[in-house]
Amino acid sequence: MAEAVPTDEQLGTAVLAALGRVIDPEIRRPVTELDMIRGVDVQPGGAVRVDLQLTIVGCPAADTIERDVRVAAGSVPGVAAVEVDVSVMDPATRAALTERLRAGRPKGIQFTADSLTRVIAVTSGKGGVGKSTVTVNLAVALARRGLRVGVVDVDVHGFSVPGLMGLTDEHGVAPRPTRVDSMILPPVAHDVKVVSIGMFVDDVSTAVSWRGPMLHRTVNQFLTDVFFGDLDVLLLDLPPGTGDVAISVGQLLPHAEVLVVTTPQAAAADVAERSGIVARQTGQRVIGVVENMAGLVQPDGSVLHLFGEGGGAETAARLSRGQDTPVPVLGSVPLSVPLREGGDAGVPVVLGAPEDPSAVALTAIADRITTMGRGLAGRKLGLSLS
């Protein structure tokens, strides 16, 4: 018995359903949900014309979206040919889209105390302790667990996250995020949404020499204008020390939790304690210490402690003084060639060499963070005495 030929209406409905599986690579939502599909026209003989509207002129994802639309429509049984007419949203349609993406919320910081997103600021006292490397690996490890993760690189003067996440080209230049009106769409790498001041400079050697007010405005804009969507975890890679950016993050996100990165060296531990103390002064909770560069495993199985021992435990002990709940050492990350190579290549070690001891340690730290209870500072508990 011959298979029934679908009617034009049935074919159009099937094509529209297939297009619902096409995801905008920047907004990370179906193109049908974003009103990017303005119509599906079924013509004689199974030819289909799809009216596709992009968000802006020069959309960097245009070729990808058009290809995915063509493939999705062509995969529907009964479709003989696919034509895609590409246009651009008018200002009114684009404004309606940005309003819908914001879910009707007024423009402002997305990550308030009552949001469902867990905000973790990764800080250190000294530079060069591997804070950014720890941040990106934790982000990717959490994303591999199925969480929706974003990273904000607020180390404005020493940005490195785009390179560590593989977002830079052969010249070290990161892609400039797409703007939809006042909304900034963060690039995605390894299933993590990322934004950094390094995406707004034209040359990797450009020195960003801003003072307090500009730094505060930058942090505020990243937290206000960048569309991250619904995240489970947002990690902030802070600059080392206790300067303007740390203070701004404390003011803008007083409910954020803080993760302190140090090395086993006593000098690093001394300074790391200060970064935790400053975080507490703004109401933030220190959830733990990560000891990086903990040792180098030798061929005979012995460990060479290039930076000494005990810095992580000492930092945690100092930050625990006078606290009801002790600050734990969440883990120690050993020195590792694959860890360094992964950073240089833009493939974090938890993804590129998951069996390496450093990757195992970082993944365990990420898992431990997910099992820790989120702080209630600043959150409404929804209790009623009536």
Region locations from a protein language model:
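N-proximal, solvent-exposed amphipathic alpha-helical segments enriched in charged/polar residues
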Residues: 2-38
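Walker A/P-loop phosphate-binding motif and the immediately C-terminal alpha-helix
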Residues: 118-156, 276
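Flexible beta-alpha connector loops of hexameric P-loop NTPases
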Residues: 58-60, 201-214, 260, 264-267
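Extreme N-terminal, non-catalytic leader segments
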Residues: 33-36, 41-44, 55, 62-124, ...
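Conserved catalytic-core segment of NTP-binding enzymes
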Residues: 69, 221, 225-228, 232-332, ...
